[in-house]
């Protein structure tokens, strides 16, 4: 069974990539295993001095669920079973690490996300994942 990792952040381009990927699933003889991944940026500065770790973890979980919501809805609408995950860290590093952990066959990613670089043709996260990953990457525009 093929295993796909789709990093999503809740952006329009991320959700469009999920919608296009769903259309491609007809090409496969058997239903693949699909993992949605949302990566939250770690809290910076002195936040931990004022907010307890549990509250920070809850914040990351809440924001991660928001980032996954539309993609999960698209999968549900199409009747596709998927697993979803939320992690915290540097997005490109966490995407590649998680893809290796689950032994995925391909990373499917949109060209841009919610980051500062969203106006560029190819966002920095997608670009770095394509450069650094030893796992094949499918960029869906």
Where are these regions (language model features)?
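Class I S-adenosyl-L-methionine
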Residues: 22, 69-76
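Absolute protein N-terminus
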Residues: 1-2, 141
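General small-molecule cofactor/ligand-binding pocket signal
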Residues: 35-37, 83-87, 138
């Amino acid at each position: 069974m093929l295993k796909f990792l789709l990093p999503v952040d809740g952006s329009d381009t991320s959700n469009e990539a999920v919608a296009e990927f769903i259309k491609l699933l007809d090409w496969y003889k058997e239903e693949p295993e699909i993992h949605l991944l949302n990566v939250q940026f770690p809290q910076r500065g002195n936040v931990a001095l004022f907010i307890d770790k549990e509250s920070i973890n809850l914040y990351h979980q809440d924001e991660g669920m928001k980032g996954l919501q539309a993609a999960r809805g698209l999968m549900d609408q199409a009747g596709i079973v998927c697993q979803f995950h939320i992690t915290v860290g540097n997005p490109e590093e966490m995407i590649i690490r998680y893809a290796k952990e689950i032994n995925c066959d391909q990373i499917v990613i949109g060209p841009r996300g919610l980051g500062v670089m969203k106006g560029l043709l190819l966002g920095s996260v997608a670009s770095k994942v394509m450069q650094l990953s030893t796992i094949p990457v499918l960029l869906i525009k």
